[in-house]
Design a protein with these regions (language model features):
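A structural boundary/capping signal
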Residues: 8-199
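N-terminal signal peptide c-region/cleavage motif recognized by signal peptidases
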Residues: 4-6
Length: 199
């Protein structure tokens, strides 16, 4: 049984979260911008995962089951992977990879969560790798899940899945919904970090 299937099949108790009445809010999407070098190099190593045709944007319909499944995947990855910098792990400043050996930094958590949700049938177009500045002002990567009830953030620094407006982060850029190799600026144009994170 695939890890994603096993995790989603497990028990999980969670609050209703977004199912309390609230108007969805979406981050402002700007012009195309440069993809992070970590993503570019990831696509050289995992070419088959990055060769894709442009597609129409798709949002997840966030049913109670979908919400619970998302929480399960987020919690399982956060609890299963031990944090380690790329320099400690690979001897380089920036490398995006799947944390198959149980260690990784923020981008690696994101890649695994994205893969597990896609394996469970979630649309790629709604699972967007996102670069932010965290509460300390450091570069950081999270997974944005775009739904009909707003955009939610899966984050290795935060155990809860939060709406993007409640993270306290400044959103810099992310994958476009139509093509994961096209990245778009978010909010007001600002200088993006050269690397994503050392954590």
């Amino acid at each position: 049984m695939a890890a994603s299937t096993a995790v989603i099949a497990g028990e999980y108790t969670a609050s209703l979260g977004p199912f309390e009445p609230e108007s969805p809010v979406y981050v402002a999407v700007g012009e195309p911008t440069r993809a992070p070098i970590g993503w570019v190099n990831f696509c050289i190593e995992y070419r088959s995962e990055c060769v894709t045709k442009a597609s129409d944007p798709r949002d997840v319909v966030l049913t109670p089951k979908a919400w619970t499944d998302m929480l399960k995947v987020n919690a399982w990855v956060n609890q299963s992977i031990k944090p380690m910098t790329d320099l400690e792990h690979w001897g380089v400043v920036e490398r995006w990879n799947y944390p198959d050996d149980g260690y990784g930094d923020c981008e690696d958590y994101v890649l695994l969560k994205r893969r597990m949700l896609m394996q469970a049938g979630w649309p790629r177009e709604a699972l967007l790798i996102t670069v932010v500045r965290d509460k300390k002002g450091d570069g950081h990567a999270v997974l944005t899940v775009k739904t009909d009830r707003g955009e939610f953030i899966l984050d290795n620094q935060e155990p809860e899945v939060l709406p993007w407006t409640k993270t306290g982060y400044r959103f810099v850029k992310r994958q476009s919904q139509s093509d994961p190799n096209v990245w778009v600026a978010l909010g007001e144009p600002r200088t993006a970090p050269a690397t994503v994170s050392a954590r």
